[in-house]
Regions:
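Active-site-adjacent structural segments surrounding the nucleophilic cysteine of cysteine proteases
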Residues: 1-83, 142
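Extracytoplasmic/secreted envelope proteins and their assembly/folding machinery
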Residues: 34-42, 58, 88, 92, ...
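A short acidic/basic microdomain associated with nuclease active sites
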Residues: 58, 104-106
Length: 220
């Protein structure tokens, strides 16, 4: 449970490759970062979904608020390797349809994003964001956060300026693989990226339209 600006909110942290999600073990292990991030935020902001699991997201709000054609394509028709995770647009849309207000920021400069992210976290609200393998500062590809693309959640900012991060994957370089991490914002922003094109696809269909971050707002 986290407390910020006088409010308390309970976030559940999920391990996408825990293999304890019936029917969707393999999908979540391969593609589940977006689903886990959505479950973490939805359960924290809307009491009607308190305790929701990633597998319940797939069979519940994801199925409800995406087209039957798209949902069936990703979870029934395609092979595991060909299946795709929810896009940031898809996450934003499902949250709004589930009563959780948010703003999907697609384009930004690093200086704008740094100020915007810290300011938003200081209100006690979270941010869902995307990173890639390529480091935007050095231009090199690393495995620090992902082998390709990865969705995570920023939960808050500490008094020392570091941010509290919810990651659905264990990483050996951080405290023996702990998924709740305290890191410098710059460590994340070096791997974040803005959109260079616009898409309303509910599922990932290319990095150019899936960058940016989602600012979550308290339900009024």
């Amino acid at each position: 449970m986290l407390t910020a600006t006088g409010k308390q909110r309970t976030y559940r942290l999920f391990k996408q490759n825990a293999h304890n999600y019936p029917r969707y073990d393999s999908y979540l292990a391969w593609h589940g970062c977006a689903t886990c991030s959505l479950a973490t935020v939805l359960g924290a902001y809307n009491d009607n979904y308190s305790g929701i699991l990633p597998s319940s997201v797939i069979d519940g709000v994801e199925k409800q608020f995406t087209s039957n054609k798209d949902w069936t394509r990703e979870h029934v028709n395609r092979s595991l390797r060909g299946q795709m995770p929810l896009s940031l647009y898809g996450i934003s849309s499902i949250l709004k349809s589930s009563g959780v207000d948010n703003n999907y920021v697609r384009t930004y400069t690093d200086s704008e994003a740094k100020h915007d992210i810290i300011s938003h976290l200081k209100t006690g609200n979270s941010i869902i964001f995307e990173v890639r393998q390529k480091n935007s500062r050095t231009g090199k590809r690393t495995k620090r956060w992902t082998n390709s693309y990865h969705t995570m959640v920023l939960l808050g900012v500490l008094t020392n300026g570091k941010v509290l991060l919810c990651d659905s994957v264990d990483r050996p370089w951080y405290n023996g693989g702990q998924r709740l991490k305290i890191v410098d914002l710059s460590d994340i922003m070096e791997y974040m990226f803005p959109c260079t094109s616009f898409s309303e696809s509910m599922y990932y269909n290319g990095a150019s339209s899936d960058g940016g971050y989602i600012k979550i707002y308290e339900i009024s």
